[in-house]
């Protein structure tokens, strides 16, 4: 992944947070929120097998959290608490609740994905109420330029809770959590525009290996690994936002989808860890809401 240049761009920002006595009046803020990352999965928290040198560098010159606890074990409610500062006793979002009466079991339906792909009104989760105060709106009032890049999950397209309406001047990424289960989507959202990714094809996350495919043959998984890896596209937008606001106070909220399932990474990076950790003998061939994966441990490490 294209982390080297991104980390280099962010290090000056991170360095500011580590020197409280030298902080400017309005220091830039970069908040990283990883998705389903284990506490010990980064080098700065003691991990020895998975290599995370660039994140470790950010941690060394910034702030790491050792006593920050999530308010919920699910994506949307935990994000709601972070965005609003409310614990789950008062939070508006308390579950991964779909819109239009869709039930969890329905999420395995290809027709559901096709419908949300064709009509954005069927995309996304239960929205925050219009006018909700968030860290984005608070920072805007303080004179900051704000961006959220990554996964949103707190209100679908055409609702009152699109990121641009919740305090973020710029948004790029996944509006809907279910579509974020693929790292090779054929579209992402840029503000309120659905942007199709040339070279990637429509592939619902309930897709499976072709009938008769050999689950131990890496080529059987080719259809799930397309041209553009969504994280790389997000890194480019992050760098652009940082560059364009170099002279302005900004807050960047990077809600990366890594390393949430489906565990996917570019093949060369996965094979690096296959060689390092050893061949795996148990592929995931029926991942429920996620794609099949030949080397789940190595793919997780590569992410």
Where are each of the predicted segments found?
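Active-site-proximal cap/lid insertion segments
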Residues: 23-24, 34-50, 66, 70, ...
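Hydrophobic helical h-region of N-terminal Sec-dependent signal peptides
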Residues: 10-12
């Amino acid at each position: 992944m294209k982390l080297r240049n991104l980390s280099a761009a962010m290090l000056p920002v991170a360095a500011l947070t580590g020197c409280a006595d030298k902080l400017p009046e309005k220091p830039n803020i970069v908040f990283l929120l990883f998705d389903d990352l284990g506490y010990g999965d980064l080098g700065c928290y003691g991990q020895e097998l998975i290599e995370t040198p660039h994140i470790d560098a950010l941690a060394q010159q910034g702030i790491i959290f050792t006593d920050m606890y999530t308010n919920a074990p699910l994506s949307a409610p935990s994000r709601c608490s972070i965005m609003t500062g409310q614990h789950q006793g008062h939070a508006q979002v308390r579950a991964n609740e779909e819109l239009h009466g869709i039930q969890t079991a329905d999420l395995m339906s290809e027709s559901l994905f096709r419908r949300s792909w064709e009509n954005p009104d069927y995309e996304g989760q239960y929205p925050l109420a219009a006018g909700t105060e968030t860290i984005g709106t608070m920072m805007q009032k303080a004179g900051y330029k704000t961006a959220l890049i990554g996964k949103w999950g707190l209100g679908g397209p055409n609702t009152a809770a699109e990121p641009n309406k919740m305090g973020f001047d710029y948004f790029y990424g996944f509006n809907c959590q279910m579509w974020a289960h693929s790292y090779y989507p054929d579209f992402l959202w840029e503000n309120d525009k659905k942007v199709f990714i040339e070279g990637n094809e429509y592939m619902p996350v309930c897709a499976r290996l072709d009938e008769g495919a050999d689950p131990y043959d890496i080529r059987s998984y080719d259809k799930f690994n397309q041209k553009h890896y969504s994280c790389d596209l997000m890194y480019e937008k992050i760098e652009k936002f940082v560059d364009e606001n170099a002279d302005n106070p900004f807050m960047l909220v990077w809600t990366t989808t890594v390393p949430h399932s489906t565990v996917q990474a570019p093949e060369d990076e996965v094979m690096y860890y296959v060689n390092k950790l050893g061949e795996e003998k148990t592929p995931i061939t029926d991942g429920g809401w996620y794609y099949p994966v030949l080397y789940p441990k190595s793919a997780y490490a590569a992410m």
